[in-house]
Amino acid sequence: MALRSLGTTGLHIPPLVFGGNVFGWTVDEQQSFSLLDALLERGLNAIDTADVYSAWAPGNKGGESETILGKWFAAHPGAREKITLFTKVGSDLKAQRLMLRTM
């Protein structure tokens, strides 16, 4: 897939970004690893995640997506250097409020 410049950051990403909100929610760790392997094999290099992903699922606290991504990176030396990882912090979905303020 052709990569595009991300503004003036020097980063190059495909026009599609993979959503990591499914990790630890609708797909388990093993399925997540398979999806991430396929993503990298096909030349995609951008993944979106957030600390609140899957916090809405019973038994989850949030952070499941990052935990699975961290385990996958640990099991795949060199993969982290190939991936552009987008994340967000500061929201509390249960309280339905923003915890951090922007300036």
UniProtKB/Swiss-Prot annotation:
InterPro entries: AKR_Detox_Biosynth (IPR050523), NADP_OxRdtase_dom (IPR023210), NADP_OxRdtase_dom_sf (IPR036812)
GO CC, one annotated term: cytosol
SUPFAM superfamilies: NAD(P)-linked oxidoreductase
A Pfam family: Aldo_ket_red
Signal peptide annotation: none
PANTHER family: NADH-SPECIFIC METHYLGLYOXAL REDUCTASE-RELATED, OXIDOREDUCTASE-RELATED
Protein's name according to its UniProt entry: Uncharacterized 11.2 kDa protein in crtE 3'region
Species of origin: Pseudescherichia vulneris (Escherichia vulneris)
